[in-house]
């Protein structure tokens, strides 16, 4: 396991689940529930992975334009109601770039708060209408998570984690990630969009079954 993992087990059959998300993607927040419902009793290591839907200088979306209200009315709000998730289209305009928030994620990961950071950032934007593109807002959230606010702000101002974030984006490109959320389960199963608990659970159990068969078909130094 590493600092980015939310692990519910420590056995050799632990299945990795990589989740690429962006903090301004409502479907990433909606994916949290199915993910945890499917895996709460399974041996998995969940790692949230950075992905910028609209990196600078690509213009970000504006809630007063037609697109966001339309997609929220057609897809986000109906799904959220079915899932019982409290989520609201933020009024922050234009929507923030998320590079700085993701550099903050790298700081959080290095200081043992990666698992809490991504869900907290999603709640800050979609439930609290906070501008997560602002350093002062990010620093307040970091303090809420028990991180050193001064050290956090200093690191982001200095660009200490810029290279780590750029490497994370290269990893996303290597996995051919183009949408958020994207889940890679055990390096074998790929799910794009909000998954159902059944999809995730089946993928994890299938991999664990394959691991069990592979382990059973070998002899160790102490016998077969």
Language-model segments: what does each one mean?
Residues 2, 27-39, 67, 120-224:
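C-terminal cap of thioredoxin/glutaredoxin-like
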Residues 4-14:
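Compositionally biased, intrinsically disordered low-complexity segments enriched
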Residues 12-35:
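Local sequence-structure signature of Cys/Sec-based thiol-disulfide redox active-site neighborhoods
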Residues 14, 101, 179-180:
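A structure-centric signal for secondary-structure junctions around beta-strands
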Residues 29-125, 218-220, 224:
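Structural alpha/beta surface segment adjacent to cysteine/selenocysteine redox centers
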């Amino acid at each position: 396991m590493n600092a980015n993992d939310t692990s519910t087990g420590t056995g050799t059959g632990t299945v990795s689940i990589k989740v690429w998300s962006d903090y301004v993607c409502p479907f990433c927040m909606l994916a949290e529930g199915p993910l945890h419902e499917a895996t709460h009793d399974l041996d998995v290591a969940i790692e949230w992975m950075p992905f910028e839907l609209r990196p600078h200088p690509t213009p970000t979306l504006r809630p007063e334009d037609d697109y966001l209200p339309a997609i929220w009315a057609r897809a986000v709000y109906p799904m959220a109601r079915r899932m019982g998730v409290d989520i609201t289209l933020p009024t922050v305009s234009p929507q923030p770039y998320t590079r700085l928030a993701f550099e903050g994620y790298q700081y959080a990961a290095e200081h043992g708060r990666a698992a809490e950071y991504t869900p907290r950032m999603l709640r800050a934007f979609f439930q609290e209408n906070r501008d997560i593109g602002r350093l002062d807002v990010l620093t307040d959230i970091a303090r809420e998570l028990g991180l050193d606010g001064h050290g956090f702000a200093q690191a982001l101002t200095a660009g200490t984690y810029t290279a780590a974030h750029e490497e994370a984006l290269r990893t996303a490109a290597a996995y051919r990630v183009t949408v958020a959320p994207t889940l890679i389960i055990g390096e074998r199963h790929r799910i794009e969009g909000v998954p159902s608990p059944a999809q995730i659970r089946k993928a994890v159990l299938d991999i664990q079954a394959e691991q069990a068969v592979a382990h059973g078909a070998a002899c160790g130094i102490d016998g077969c």
